[in-house]
Design a protein with these regions (language model features):
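Conserved beta-strand signature within the Rossmann-like core of class I S-adenosyl-L-methionine
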Residues: 222-230
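Feature captures hydrophobic
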Residues: 1-110, 116, 123
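Conserved class I S-adenosyl-L-methionine
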Residues: 125-133
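A short glycine-rich, Lys/Arg-flanked "PGG" loop and its adjoining helix->strand segment in the class I
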Residues: 209-222
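Conserved SAM-binding loop of SAM-dependent methyltransferases across substrates and taxa
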Residues: 136-147
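Substrate-binding/catalytic lobe of Class I Rossmann-like enzymes that use SAM or dcSAM, i.e.
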Residues: 231-321
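Conserved SAM-binding loop
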Residues: 164-165
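A short acidic, Gly/Pro-enriched loop at the edge of an enzyme's catalytic core
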Residues: 185-194
Length: 321
């Protein structure tokens, strides 16, 4: 293990876990101990230059052009809906919930999150809303239940597209909820509101200005956008961009967790959008991951029976820590 750590850096350490070279009764507690009160530990341990250079080159090849973005999304999201059903809650929501009391189930917390977004955007009957990155249709379904607004929701995942369409048809609201399979950069039209829930992590740093510019173009004059994002602390972002890490190379190719400053700069660079309210949900994100990890571990045997081998399962357990 230590030889791989020296040769391959932090990625070698992660890969050694995936390969079964080391284990621990409580992976989360072990990783928390490594990182406790030591922010520098979050910066990658590079290992040997040639190995790291190869990883960086591979990541560069996965930059989110329109054609590559579809491949990156498919790698992560098209693993099979039955796989995700085993550890997500019944809303099939793959983004942070909001635990208002701390005692509610993940499903109730996800519905509370959707309700909060709908209330904040003030969606009304007759308005047309756009969702960029609709996942399995959780927000679309909740919006249909709560309002009379129209919604166009987009994804480029084949599995999500099929599931979300069937979901909307089953609910009988296909007359006002439309699921489309289209890259956000190809969208046209005018919308009263735009919502994007933890999709920005799939955009890529170099495409952030394009993302916000497209949102601005799609909004009406009095329109507003709501973006839910996992963020990187500003003081770590430059180092993060220079390196590669476990998630971006092993789990979600092409992904990038932006900092708040990076998003604000991207907004100013190519759009006339104006940031207003910011809500920090860091605790809720950590809690959501914990609930997912618990369900994943509880259902690991069922996941294995679907054909996902031990290497794959260990990769996802590590990812959910």
């Amino acid at each position: 293990v230590f030889a791989r750590l020296i040769r391959e850096g932090d990625l070698g350490f992660c890969d050694a876990y995936l390969d079964g070279w080391w284990s621990t009764p409580d992976l989360q507690a072990f990783l928390d101990l490594i990182h406790a009160d030591n922010d520098e530990m979050y910066d990658s341990f590079p290992g040997m230059g040639m190995v790291r250079a190869w990883e960086k080159f591979r990541f560069w090849l996965q930059s989110n052009s329109k054609s590559q973005a579809k491949k990156n999304i498919s790698y992560h999201y098209d693993l099979g809906n039955d796989f995700y059903k085993l550890w997500l809650d019944d809303t099939m929501t793959y983004s942070s919930a909001i635990f208002e009391s701390g005692q509610e189930s993940t499903e109730k917390a996800q519905l509370a999150k959707y309700g909060s977004l709908i209330d904040q955007m003030g969606a009304k009957k007759g308005e047309h809303i756009l969702e960029i990155g609709c996942g399995w249709g959780g927000f679309a379904a909740r919006l249909a239940e709560r309002t009379g607004a129209r919604l166009t929701a987009t994804t480029i995942s084949e599995e999500q597209y099929k599931y979300a369409r069937e979901r909307i048809e089953t609910l009988g609201v296909a007359d006002r909820i439309s699921i489309v399979k289209q890259d956000y950069r190809n969208l046209t039209g005018q919308f009263d509101r735009v919502v994007s829930i933890e999709m920005i992590e799939a955009v890529g740093h170099e495409y952030l200005p394009t993302y916000f510019s497209k949102i601005a173009d799609l909004l009406t004059t009095e329109g507003a956008a709501m973006i839910q994002a996992i963020t990187m602390p500003d003081h770590r972002y430059s180092q993060y961009l220079r390196e590669v890490d476990y998630i971006r190379t092993r789990v979600f190719p092409g992904s990038n967790v932006p900092s708040i400053s990076a998003m604000v700069e991207a907004v100013a660079k190519k759009s006339d959008l104006r940031p207003t309210n910011i809500f920090d949900f860091g605790y809720h994100c950590a809690r959501t991951l914990r609930e997912w990890r618990i369900r994943f571990l509880e259902n690991e045997d069922k996941i294995a029976k679907l054909g996902y081998d031990e290497h794959f399962r260990r990769a996802w357990i590590y990812y959910l820590c």
